[in-house]
C-alpha cells in the first residue's frame, strides 16, 4: 500500500504525440511607390549604381524571408494605386511577383493617400492588433482622390499601425567645370506628411538615403513587429496518479 501511495505522490503521467499549435501572426501590407522618380539611379547594389526601385525591390524581397508565418500583401502605386498581391501566407509567390514589378506600372505620379486607403480597405475585417502597413515613397502626393492625412485618420480609427519610409539621396551627381560634383537635391520627399502619417497611427518614420540605410530600416521594422506565430509543439498530458491511489485504497479496504 505504501509503495502505491508513493507512486501516486510521484504523479505519473501519460504524454501523447506532439501537436503543432499556431498562434496568430501579422497581416502586413507593403505599400510601394513605383512612380517615375523611382528610376533615379542614386542607390547602390553590389558596388554598382542602381535605380531606387531596384534597391527597394531587393530589400523588400529580403524582408519577406524574415516574415514566415505572417500574411503579406503588396500594393503598388503611382498615379493610381492597385492591389498587386492580396494578403497571403505564400511569401515565395509574393517575392516572385515583386521581382517582376517595375516603375511606371501604376503611372508616373504619386497617389499616397489612395495607396494607404487601399491598404486599409484590404485589412478592414481583420483584428486591429494584427494589422501593419509599411509605406515607402520617394516623393510628395500629387495625384489621387484621397489625401494622405485623411487616410491616416482612418487608419488611426481602425487601429492600423503605419510605418513610413522616405527613400532617396540628399544629393545628385552633376557635371561641373572640374568634373562630376555632388549637388544638393531639392525637397522631393514630403517628409512632413510621412512623419505625420506615422505619428498619427502609432508607427515610425524612417529616411533611407542609400541602400545600407534601407536595409537597416527594414531590419528595424522586422524587430519592431516580430512574427508572433512561431510554431509551438506540445504533448497532451493525462494524469495517472489516480490509478495507484485507487489501488492503494482498494488494498487498504480489503486488508481492513
What is each PLM-predicted segment?
Residues 42-50, 60, 81-84, 100-108, ...:
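Second-shell loop/turn segments in exported
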Residues 1-29, 34-61, 65:
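An amphipathic, basic-hydrophobic helix/alpha-beta surface used to engage anionic
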Residues 1-20, 227-256:
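C-terminal signal-anchor/stop-transfer transmembrane helix together with its immediate cytosolic
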Residues 23-29, 58, 67-72, 82, ...:
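Extracytoplasmic
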Amino acid at each position: 500500500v505504501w509503495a502505491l501511495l508513493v507512486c501516486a505522490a510521484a504523479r505519473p503521467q501519460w504524454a501523447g504525440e506532439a501537436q503543432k499549435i499556431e498562434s496568430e501572426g501579422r497581416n502586413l501590407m507593403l505599400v510601394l511607390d513605383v512612380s517615375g522618380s523611382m528610376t533615379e539611379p542614386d542607390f547602390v547594389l553590389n558596388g554598382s549604381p542602381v535605380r531606387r526601385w531596384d534597391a527597394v525591390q531587393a530589400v523588400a524581397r529580403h524582408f519577406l524571408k524574415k516574415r514566415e508565418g505572417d500574411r503579406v500583401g503588396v500594393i503598388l502605386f503611382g498615379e493610381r494605386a492597385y492591389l498587386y498581391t492580396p494578403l497571403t501566407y505564400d511569401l515565395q509567390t509574393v517575392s516572385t511577383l515583386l521581382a517582376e514589378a517595375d516603375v511606371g506600372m501604376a503611372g508616373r505620379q504619386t497617389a499616397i493617400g489612395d495607396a494607404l486607403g487601399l491598404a486599409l480597405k484590404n485589412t478592414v475585417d481583420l483584428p486591429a492588433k494584427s494589422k501593419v502597413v509599411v509605406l515607402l515613397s520617394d516623393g510628395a502626393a500629387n495625384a489621387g482622390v484621397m489625401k494622405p492625412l485623411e487616410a491616416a485618420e482612418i487608419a488611426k480609427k481602425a487601429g492600423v499601425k503605419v510605418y513610413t519610409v522616405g527613400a532617396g539621396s540628399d544629393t545628385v551627381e552633376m557635371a561641373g567645370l572640374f568634373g562630376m560634383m555632388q549637388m544638393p537635391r531639392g525637397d522631393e520627399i514630403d517628409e512632413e506628411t510621412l512623419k505625420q502619417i506615422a505619428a498619427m497611427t502609432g508607427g515610425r518614420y524612417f529616411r533611407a538615403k542609400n541602400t545600407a540605410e534601407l536595409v537597416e530600416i527594414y531590419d528595424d521594422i522586422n524587430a519592431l513587429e516580430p512574427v508572433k506565430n512561431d510554431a509551438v509543439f506540445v504533448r497532451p498530458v493525462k494524469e495517472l496518479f489516480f490509478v495507484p491511489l485507487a489501488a492503494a485504497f482498494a488494498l487498504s479496504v480489503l486488508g481492513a
